[in-house]
Structures are given as structure tokens and as C-alpha cells.
Swiss-Prot record:
UniProt-recorded name of the protein: Maturase K
Family: Belongs to the intron maturase 2 family. MatK subfamily.
Known role: Usually encoded in the trnK tRNA gene intron. Probably assists in splicing its own and other chloroplast group II introns.
Taxon lineage: Eukaryota, Viridiplantae, Streptophyta, Embryophyta, Tracheophyta
GO biological process, one term: tRNA processing
Cellular localisation: Plastid, Chloroplast
Gene designation: matK
GO molecular function, one term: RNA binding
Species of origin: Primula veris (Cowslip)
Keywords: Chloroplast, mRNA processing, Plastid, RNA-binding, tRNA processing
Amino acid sequence: MEEFKRYLELDKSKSQQHDFLYPLLFQEYIYGLAHHNQSLTRSSSLELEKTGFDNNFSLLIVKRLITQMGRQNHLSFFTNDSNQNPFLGHNTTLYSKILLDGFVVVLEIPFSIRVISSLECKEIVKSHNLRSIHSIFPFLEDKFTHLNYVLDFLIPHFIHLEILVQTLRYWVKDASSLHLLRALIHKYHNWNNIITLKKSSFSFSKRNKRFLFFLYNFHVYEYESIFTFLRNQSSHLKSNSYRPFLDRIYFYEKRDHFLEIFTNYFQAILCSFKDPFMHYVRYQGKALLASKGVFLLINKWNSYLVNFWQCYFYTWSQPGRIQINKLSNHSLDLLGYLSSVRLTSSMVRNQMLENVFLIANASKKLNTIVPIIPLIGSLSKAKFCNPLGHPISKPVWADLSDSDIIDRFGRIYRNISHYYSGSSKKMSLYRIKYIIRLSCARTLARKHKSTVRAFLKRTGSELLEEFFMEEERIFSLTFPKISSTSTSGGLYRNPIWYLDIFCINDLANHE
């Protein structure tokens, strides 16, 4: 019991640091740090976006904003979004954007301190918590072959940001910061300004992305910390240490009545969920809950998840957002792969004295397949081919030098080949290589006002091979024994998971 109290409660020395967050909003370097972080994030992406914040950000505006913050009421910043603010003399959208980005930097301070301190106290290697997203697949290879059913669901987003503000009160003791956060939220009272709904997921608007990412990650952290604990408690039926978690979730006096009712029946509910072979995996806004049990057990977890979100976070999950699949019959759309468990049979010859027996041996194996059709659709959206998969030229790159054009196409192919190196069937990557290579040739031919055949005849096909074969050469130097048995062209058969990938490939987001 004391262990979970220490997990839930902040140290007094650390909680006092949270009382002094608001004065940081009056420091110029906070906004400069927020602007610098955004510039680094955008420079690492494939496409650079120019926003109003980039075009209008300056230290002079920040100084004027800080001066007015000390003189005026918070609500004076947000009285009018379209016209000039009489106190500031500028459009309030720019000021609110700068203030939001600075506010996120301030809020990240106590959470980063808590993470670092927890790692130091537990002596946990930092790389253990910051490992590659490709580490999920070796876990699937080891665990999923022994499981039967998987619950594939999208984590529901919060209905109202006020719920998150109330949750933040547990972590941030600074009342002034919370009041300012409420003022910023009321400015975006229209939910469509914050979140754009899609068929299977949702995305944040570009103007508020950094702010909403922080709130959403905090929402997921709260959900996982409680749900994971309750899931673990299903194997310890006599434990009552789940009560502090319920006190942490039900915000103060608003839910006391329901809390009393729920805790009385909670221990009986956990009895029906006892499953020592339950595994939980989260990636982006999706999650998997896999079980070795029967369909009835995973269906109970399905019902429990819906009630868990509704009662704890006031979030509703649509029926189509949760799917129960049998691993032997269905494929999972996981991180750009189609993953499934298939039975593979082999014959073993056994001889005892003069008798010879043939024994059929069946084993399960995880198959990870590249979804070629959605990937071609992503290439088509990026203007590398048409919707049918026929390569086309890239006119916007025709003004670059030949080396820059080849380097861009080669880098895109190497990134795709690097990301999908763990595929069980790599023949589909030949199709992707063909599209990117011919698109590069057509772009070069367009630049030199020639045909593809005439251009390749004049320069030779070795001009493109040098760049597209770099990935295979790196692999052959790293794994010489495996590469000796690889297929022609360097596309090896065995899955190789690169554990240095920390973000999903842009072309793997088939949305």
C-alpha cells in the first residue's frame, strides 16, 4: 500500500516547485525557447510549413506581450479574435499563439523533473523508457504467437478541455497558471478550432498543435497509469490498493457518491478479469490489449474499457473504434505494417530402431507485411506516381541540380527501406523502388528536356544505382553472414528491426 502511495503522491519539496510556474511566463527566454524548439521540429520534417507565428515572432512583440500581461486582466487578451485589441494594438490570435507555446514550455518543467527524478530513484536506464518504436515488433514476435485474441482500439479523445484542467490540478499547484490556462481554453471555445475529426482518428489543428499535444499526452499518461495498475490488480484479488487511484481520478467532491458505489463492487469486478497472460501495447493514438484467454474474457475487457473511459474521464468511445480480432484469422494495422499470426507446418523424420515415423510439427509465426496499396496511395499523394502506381515526374524539383534530385529520391527510398526492413515479405519493396527510381529518372529527363530512354542512354543507369544500393551495402557490412544468403538485389528475407527509429515514417501514415 505504501508503495502505491509513494507512486501517487508528489514529494513536498517537488510540489512546492510547481507553485512558481506562473512567474516564468514573464521571462523572455521561455518564448525564445518555444520558438527555437518549433524551428528544430519543422526543420527535421520532410515539408517545411510557414505559419503566422514564424512570420511575426520577434522579441519586441514578446516584450510588449509581457508588459501588457502585468497591466491587464487575462480576459482582455481574448475579447476579440478578429479585430485589433484596444489594449495591445495587435491581433489577439498572434499573442495567444505565442502565449500558448510559452505556457507549454512552462508546464513541461514539472513533468520533466518528475520523470528524471523517478529514473534516478529507481536507477532505470533512460534508454529503457526511450526505446525505438520498432521494439514493439520483437515483443510481438516473442509474445503474440502464444496469444489468441487481441482488442484493437483507438484511445478516445477528451470531450472538454476543462476535464484536463481539473486533472492538472493534481500535478500543478499554481492557481494562477491554471486560471490562465482556462482563459486560453475559453478563447478556443469552438471545438472544431482545436481538433479535426477523421473517420478513424483525429488530428490537431496546426495552430494549436504543440499545446494540444501536451494536453493529449498528459491525458494518455493519466489513462495508462490507472488502467495499467487496475489491469495488474486483476491477478491479485485480495488487494485493496486500487482505492488511491480512484481517489486520484475522481476529481474532488464532484464524484464522491459514485466513488463510494464503485469501490464497493470493484473487487468483485476484478475477479472476472483474472488473466495473467494479458499484454498491453500503445502506439500513437491506438492501443492493443492481447489475451491468451477465450473470447468471453476479451469481450469483458471490451465492456470494461468503455465504462472505464465514461466513468473516469467522461469520454465516449464509438463502437467502431474498438475491434476484437482473432489473431489466427485477422491482420492488425500496426505502425504501417499488416501484422498477423500464421501457422507454419513442417515434417520431422523420427527413427526408432527399425521403425521410421513422420511427425507433423505446427508452429506459429508472426508475419509482418508491407501494405503496398496504401503505400502507393501515399506516394500518389506526394506526387511520385498516379493513383494506379505509374511513376510520374516531380516538377517542383526540376529546378534543382542533378545531384540534389538524385539525393532526395535516394533518401526517400532509403528511409522507406529502412523502416520496412522488418517485413516478412519484401518483394513489395521492389515495386516501391521501381516507382521512386523511375520518378527520379523522369524528373531528370524533364529538367534536361529529354526522354527517359535518351537520358539514361546518355548518362547510364549506374547514375541511379549508386544511390539506391547504399541501404543494401550498409546491411551487408553490418550483417555479412545474413547478407550472404540474401536474395538477389540485396533485399534479404529475414526481418531486421532497426532500433534507432523513434518516429513513424511519414508514408506509413495511410490516413
